Amino acid sequence: IMTAVETVIREGRPHGKLCIGFTPDEEIGEGADLFDIPGFGADFAYTVDGGDAGDIEYENFNAAAATVTIHGFSVHPGSAKDTMINASNVAMEFHGALPVMARPETTEGRQGFYHLCQMYGDVTTAKLGYILRDHDAAKLQFKKDNMQDIADYLNGKYGAGTVEVEIKDSYRNMLEKIKPHFHLIETARKAVRMAGLEPVEVPVRGGTDGATLSWNGLPCPNLGTGGFNFHGVCECTTAE
């Protein structure tokens, strides 16, 4: 990004007002929460946040995070019949009630998912940490409701308060905020073709700071960088 800015200045290329910003906390989902949009001074923007060369991305997941806490009842295993509630077993029962075909490893395209990111527990207490994703806000709400329904069922089975579900929204699909400013996409298409590539437009199976910026009043689609295998051990990007 800075090399591009340097080139524009050094070569005296004609341009309008350009605003450049860097957000430090994108990977924890808080990179744009406190971004000073009025101070930034732009009417529109693009993020450069991963994706294949030629990618133009203006539709992303709606996202939420869920924490499931299970409270068990521990007694001596030798006299546990009809008394013990093993929190770890209830945690497995909760996870087993979620659809197997709605996991990251079984979905693609516009299919949303429940992703179990972490779990730990013992007889007394267990916790499950999930992220929930869907391009369709109504389908994401269904996933939230489904988790609460499972908790209600298990509380009916094991006793009130056994399972607690806490859900927090993370970010929303930017599409609704980009549609009224679709010249951003037309301009990006033209730029990609001028660079000798063909634009590729697919819904992002993830999120970007541009989504938060768009909802906060700065319409901001994403441009691909030519990188691959993000968030994996084989992550790489082009050097050109």
Write out the residue ranges for each language-model feature:
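Alpha-helical metal-binding/catalytic segments enriched in His/Glu/Asp
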Residues: 1-26, 66-70, 76-77, 81-101, ...
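A generic structural motif
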Residues: 74-75, 132-140
